[in-house]
Amino acid sequence: MILPWLILIPFIGGLLCWMGERFGATLPRWIALITMSLLLALGLWLWANGDYSFAPAPGADPTWVREFKHIWIERFGISVHLALDGLSLLMIMLTGLLGVLSVLCSWKEIQRHVGFFHLNLMWILGGVVGVFLALDLFMFFFFWEMMLVPMYFLIALWGHSSSDGKKTRIYAATKFFIFTQASGLIMLVAILGLVLVNFNDTGVITFNYADLLKTKMSLTTEYILMLGFFIAFAVKLPVVPFHSWLPDAHAQAPTAGSVDLAGILLKTAAYGLLRFALPLFPNASAEFAPIAMTLGLIGIFYGAFLAFAQTDIKRLIAFSSVSHMGFVLIGIYSGSQLALQGAVMQMLADGLSAAALFILSGQLYERTHTRDMREMGGLWSKIAYLPALSLFFAAASLGLPGTGNFVGEFLILLGTFPAAPWITIIATSGLVFGSVYSLIMIHRAYFGPAKSDAVLHGMDGREMIMGVGLAALLIYIGVYPQPFLDTSAATMHGVQQWLGTAFTQLASAR
């Protein structure tokens, strides 16, 4: 019964924030902080008290660590079916942690309509948890689309205009909404197609994951349906050429919105590929793998090259996310358990390091009132601790050994090499560009001649706790990743079996 509460807690907390605004602006902040802390605590409790050797695998009914099922619309085979395994648990703990951080980082930034702001923030996170738990495909689609509306309000009502003043927050919010909504509708068509194919085969209408895994279909049908899912996830991940909404949404969103976008919303797409696209359509995925890995490779370089050219610090971090997600895409489609484990580690580590960079850029904006790096410079000696933390997270972002990002990238490259040596070699050279744009960002913002003589105040306790806490966690994951690898091992083994079997069949057919 604990699984529905993981989803309900953020929704109830959001309503309480909205209603609590009449008692002052501070109450909604505390309600939101307690709500997210409770979600994180429940995630940690589940981690401590679960056996994560249970996970779905081919050839048998999926087994789960925890499961909740309640018939909802019997006529169409729709049920409230939630289930937890190692992969979804890691993602829920990441959601809880970044939820706490997004409340903390907006503590002073948001002054207008504080209650409604936190309602939207909590409902985004509730929708994300729903995506990570839902197994019924109708429920999954419901939560997938539900996240978009509060995110739209978050960017449109509390966002900033771009540093050159040309692009407004409404433009960014609308672009985000249209891209993700349109891709979601393509996925809805694919879900309905899959349900109808299964109905023609069995005579039963069902949206249940376990039943749809057994659907028999021709390779052409499988390929078309797989593309429907892939496009929806590719837009959210984002994969080049579906990425153009991301820099605008990041640059114009408030800090909390950027933290949630980079840290959690992009990860729902990678989760969707691992949970739905590969297991439901293994043969089509195996055939599509070279194309997907090539798209990942293009993303690594394209994101890095565009990051070079940015003057807006938040747009630079946004393009670095495009580059990092390219590695995740390569890892997912490699068919190797090492690389799949690496993709999960990269999702966790990139969620933390990108969130940290956005939090620090928000703190920088509060002090300098600009996001344009040409107007910064010479700040290293002016703000205590903030430049040093920025340097650490920039180094983590480029994959410094000893941080979680290194573990993820190393495992992806190590696991992919036997299957696709050329892609691995080219992707490895992409790491060099990662170091260049990370160091360019630090150099432009903190070194060089000072642009103003204004006295800037140092970091307060709240800001220090966020920065140092995230740094400590990234180092912990980098030095001792085993607990996280053990948690996701069974799930990734199942995904690898689906894809590995399909690769073997494909090779023998050729």
Protein language model features and the residues they cover:
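Alpha-helical multi-pass transmembrane bundles of energy-transducing inner-membrane proteins
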Residues: 23-25, 119, 123, 127-217, ...
